Amino acid sequence: MANKDHAPEHYVTRILAEATLDGARPVVRWRDTVITGTQLDRSVRRVVTALREAGVARDHAVAVLTQVNSPWMLIVRYAAHLVGASVVYITGANHGIVTHELPVATRVRMLREAGASVLVFDESNAQLAETVDETVRDKLVLCGLGHPASGTVSVDGRPVDDVSVDFTPEAPELAMVLYTSGTTGQPKGVCRSFGSWNAAALRGAAYPRPVFLTMTAVSQTVAMIVDTVLAAGGSVLLRERFDPADFLRDVGEHRVTETFMGVAQLYAILGHPDARTADLSSLRHVLYLGCPASPERLREAAALLPGVLAQSYGSTEAGRITVLRAADHERPELLATVGRAVPGVTIAIRDPETGHDLPVGEIGEVVVHGPEVMAGYVADPEHTARVIRDGWVHTGDFGSVDERGYVRLFGRMREVVKVQDTRVSPTEVEKVLVGCPGVVDACVYGHRGPDLIEELHAAVVLGTEGAPSFDTLRDHVARAMTPTHAPIRFVRWRRFPINNTGKVNRLRVREVSAEARGDSPDVLVDR
């Protein structure tokens, strides 16, 4: 363990110090609940006491099962990090527009992989916690939570009344095991080191007293932004799901200064009829990410939100990689890029077959070296060795870097579709489709029919007025690219399912679209 006399500041002590400077100040809002600085401090300290009674020590792991984006998700993590433990969230709902609960078996797998011996749960998940406990081979210590505003905690049914006041904060080796969103497959557990998490949380906010709105789960990397805001003396507004009307109302009512969303959510806001009349004047920083955005839609977004947009490209494994800053959004030629490397990150483009670095402008795999690179996949050293080689994360993304350092992405390496001997990037086709008037969002993918010939299919969300026909969409793609790039089958969705990082759940879209028929209540099919 590092010498504590020379240890860096613990981000949770900074958060609690800022929260209690004015203990009556609201610091967390959730539903109709307001948590003040004093309440946050006392709740964290009471959970510290509970975790100690449960036998939690440095480098142990704590599993958390609460309602999505409940304040308890923050409180328990802060307490666990103070006693030197890591956290794994098994709440796991792919919330957003559509909610899909994780099976018990998946929750148990996540808990076991992380090595958690303590399960902390809220009242709404008490029965599920018992089911998980009965399913796990080794008996868990169960810590129950009351309403977030009450701060009540119990250990195996015994109420915890004491509030830890004097203690020395510990620093765990791992901060969290983050499970990837599983947009295309089974979620994987990514180990994030406490050192990199702590440094990121303490880097400071861009503006004093920020008010941050999150509509994506704080079980994911948005939690790092929440920590940065609270450590800077700001406040956070936690929402359980995304709705464009709610977003517009929240920004005006709570004078939100910063927010975080997926590209699909940004598109939904642009398409809302009240977007042009809502009061968005308080916004100073709108960070969006998840996939490359259509330049046409970004021009529309920049007109609605001038001077505040920033696009981030990153991954759970690599952390932040690039940023397209607000000033970059004023230059049309840069809107097809995802920006330049963030400070401390080095990007290389390598030949996927030879591993050699490629020259400027050539397309290859994006590989990354930086301070937020994961420690590895939990309980999977072989997969870790494939993804991290000599300290470089192999992202699996096709991309290129121009002479100024701007990165352009061309889709996932394994998602390239071969149509009539032509390699087609679904991401590039999606950008063209979303650039067509009347298209809100698009998801393009490969499909093999009975003859096993690969075809290009597309799922689209269309606007309520002036929606283009499927033939119009085919012609639009054929003119902008080639006829080979035009999808032969379209499925119209009312809205796409969104996972807990704000990305479109591509696997779900493909599965439902493949089974869809013309009489489906959710989709309209054309071929």
UniProtKB/Swiss-Prot annotation:
Superkingdom assignment: Bacteria
BP-aspect Gene Ontology terms: novobiocin biosynthetic process
Cofactor(s), names only, from the UniProt record: Mg(2+); Mn(2+)
Pathway membership: Antibiotic biosynthesis; novobiocin biosynthesis
Keyword ATP-binding annotated: yes
Coiled-coil spans in chain: none
Residues holding ATP: 180-188, 312-317, 397, 412, 503
Keyword Manganese found: yes
Pfam families with a match to the protein in the record: AMP-binding, AMP-binding_C
Catalytic activity: 3-amino-4,7-dihydroxycoumarin + 3-dimethylallyl-4-hydroxybenzoate + ATP = 8-desmethylnovobiocic acid + AMP + diphosphate
Keyword set, alphabetical order: Antibiotic biosynthesis, ATP-binding, Ligase, Magnesium, Manganese, Nucleotide-binding
pH effects: Optimum pH is 8.0.
Complex formation: Monomer.
Family: Belongs to the ATP-dependent AMP-binding enzyme family.
Name recorded for this polypeptide: 8-demethylnovobiocic acid synthase
Lineage of origin: Bacteria, Bacillati, Actinomycetota, Actinomycetes, Kitasatosporales
